[in-house]
Design a protein with these regions (language model features):
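Primarily the internal scaffold of c-type cytochrome electron-transfer domains
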Residues: 1-193
Length: 193
């Protein structure tokens, strides 16, 4: 994979980690994914209305809409080994986000409102929350921030309530609106409608 471009590496991962219909049977590494597969869209019942994965661990659709993928700066093996394991060790979890978010990685408390060494200050805890499906844990690859307003409207999971199980989405929504002056949930709600 070292000689491949970022697009080729992502396409190779996508051949297994995408919910798609095959168009051909000739796919080979370094081929263009979309020449051989028809990717499902967010209208598929395996997605929540906001685009988060509801079904199996097919991450390409949600990953494709993430700001990380859209930037073109990182690819699958930025965060994962070629066997799919997470590349960054526990104490360096947030280093995956350094290329674009250095200030937040170096001072997570201002952004997360959680203690710096807590689970709540790990980027992936809020932007890639783990959910269960068919006895399997999988993380959301859309990189959306927690959107409790979408939970209220559409029952889509949000990271706040995945950790704070004793609280409801209204509690989380109130906090998010206190902490963020910009309503980042609005566009997600609009897209989900």
């Amino acid at each position: 994979t070292k000689t491949m471009t970022k697009v080729q590496r992502n396409d190779l991962c996508s051949s297994c980690h995408a919910k798609a219909s095959p168009l051909t049977v000739e796919y080979r590494p370094e081929d263009r994914f979309y020449d051989h597969f028809d990717l499902v869209t967010l209208e598929d019942p395996d997605f929540y209305p906001d685009g988060r994965d509801l079904g199996e661990n097919y991450t390409l659709t949600s990953w494709s809409m993430s700001p990380c993928a859209k930037s073109g700066e990182i690819d699958c093996i930025h965060c994962h080994t070629s066997s799919g394991r997470y590349r960054f060790k526990k104490e360096k979890f947030n280093n995956a986000c350094l290329p674009c978010h250095e200030a937040r990685v170096n001072n997570p408390t201002d952004h997360t409102h959680h203690a710096a060494t807590s689970e709540g200050s790990k980027c992936i805890s809020c932007h890639m929350p783990m959910t269960d499906f068919a006895r399997m844990n999988r993380s959301d690859h859309s990189m959306l921030p927690p959107t409790p307003a979408v939970t209220i409207a559409y029952k889509s999971p949000n990271a706040c309530n995945i950790c704070h199980k004793d609280k409801d989405a209204e509690w989380a929504d109130k906090l998010v609106r206190q902490w963020r002056t910009r309503d980042y949930q609005g566009p997600v709600l609009k897209r989900a409608a």
